[in-house]
Amino acid sequence: MIDARNYKAQETLKNGLQVTIRAIRPEDREALIAALKGLDERTLYYRFFGAKQDFSAQELTAATDVDFVRTIALVTCIQDGEGEKIIGAGRYIAFGNAEPPDLAEVAFMVEEDYHGLGIAGKILRHLAGIAKEKGIREFHAEVLPGNKGMLAVFNKSGFPVKLEYAEGLAHVTLSLAGDAE
């Protein structure tokens, strides 16, 4: 069984950069703030569906202090001259009436300098592996239609994808049944 709270894996990005994908920890708060401050307005808009400049203490605590039962959060890190730096993050939050829950909402963010290197896809695969073991059968996401990069991550995931457009959003359903192609 996967120990999500202590999850850690090494990956190589498309450009050859080595990264660590690991469970987020409460002590990641400052590094997460730095990563969020490194996002441009468009990325913040796509991730949070509006202009977002500041994050409340409650939002930061919710982002870094997760239960690893219903909420799983992973960060992608590199080593730089000052130590570990967060360059991406992803999470899912389980919902639904089943016990244990079998549906989850999934979301990601990646620093601009690292877009297009496959980080979100790698986080998605790691989250999916944990989710499947916990009985999650579908990921759901709401994506702004202009966020072509995120839609491409889902479409290239290897999992069956269903897209529905309504109320100005793309509603994505990703079936985790079976293995990704």
Where does each model-flagged region fall?
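Long, contiguous binding/interaction regions
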Residues: 1-181
